[in-house]
Amino acid sequence: MNLAIIAGDGIGPEVIGEAVKVLDAVLPEVEKTTYDLGARRYHATGEILPDSVLEELKVHDAILLGAIGDPSVPSGVLERGLLLRIRFALDHHINLRPAKLYSGVTGPLAGNPEIDFVVVREGTEGPYTGTGGAIRVGTPHEVATEVSLNTAFGVRRVVEDAFRRAQQRRKHLTLVHKNNVLTFAGALWWRTVQEVGAEYPDVEIAYQHVDSAMIHIVTDPGRFDVIVTDNLFGDIVTDLAAAVCGGIGLAASGNIDATRTNPSMFEPVHGSAPDIAGQGIADPTAAIMSVALLLAHVGETDAAARVDKAVEAHLSSRGDQELGTAAVGDRIVGLL
């Protein structure tokens, strides 16, 4: 495997260092190329993601990202110029977010119910395409629009991926949308789920409005196996899912090109946390869990399972220990 590494800003280099340590322990033959992208490069050169670097990224099998963002750079500059550019240039049309409450992790829900589902979120359409505008800005008659773009092609490929994942899991898929109000997009999503679902007769299909789904993620999370949803609703659902599983510090994600034409990118959900950068106290668990997602995606399923089991063993036995960044990485390597 040929891996591109973007450690990024803040705690990114620290947590990615431990993630790579675990990766080397389970798959030592990986070829790695590190790219200096983020705030430091921006300040030094004015560059965010040069075309030449983007072309280099495309030839890798996968990308491992730490975190992007620094208070010295105006908000949104790095996010749009780096993260969103990679997402659209590499057609990362799926954002994959597992939600699992591990043994030993105390979640906010009473009784620590069993939680194990995955959210398949559409990643390149919806209201995040920049389609819209404003007129009469700053006047009492200002009009602003944000258009949610949904295509049959874009919806189908995400729904197909979700069904494939459901078939490999507990064979239950829930579409989360708001089709009683968003009637046009909602109809396209629901019709597509029914059409694709006919090809997977063993997968049970359910529908929930997004507000209802948010309630049930809190009150009855065990009902969910695979959730498929659009870009906006997925953005919201995945953060609540992370919260009930112990927080974004334990959340991993994958930005996936399901066609495998381009390399997919894997990253912890947490931010760059510049306030604790360089102190050696950032928890690298989410970055290590992202390595497990990456390994599963490239077909190294045994290695992925080893990492996941080691993370679970670490979380279930750490107790109240306050471990530093390197200590967590060393401990998980020891549990492989």
UniProtKB/Swiss-Prot annotation:
GO molecular function: 3-isopropylmalate dehydrogenase activity; magnesium ion binding; NAD binding
UniProt main location, coarse: cytoplasm
PANTHER family assigned: D-MALATE DEHYDROGENASE [DECARBOXYLATING]
Enzyme Commission code: 1.1.1.85
Protein's name in the database: 3-isopropylmalate dehydrogenase
Localization annotation: Cytoplasm
Details of cofactor binding: Binds 1 Mg(2+) or Mn(2+) ion per subunit.
Record function comment: Catalyzes the oxidation of 3-carboxy-2-hydroxy-4-methylpentanoate (3-isopropylmalate) to 3-carboxy-4-methyl-2-oxopentanoate. The product decarboxylates to 4-methyl-2 oxopentanoate.
Family: Belongs to the isocitrate and isopropylmalate dehydrogenases family. LeuB type 2 subfamily.
Keyword Manganese: yes
Main enzyme class: oxidoreductase
Subunit structure of this chain's protein: Homodimer.
Domain of life: Bacteria
GO cellular component, one term: cytoplasm
Site, Important for catalysis: residue positions: 128, 178
Residues reported in the UniProt entry to bind NAD(+): 271-283
Gene3D superfamilies given in the database record: Isopropylmalate Dehydrogenase (3.40.718.10)
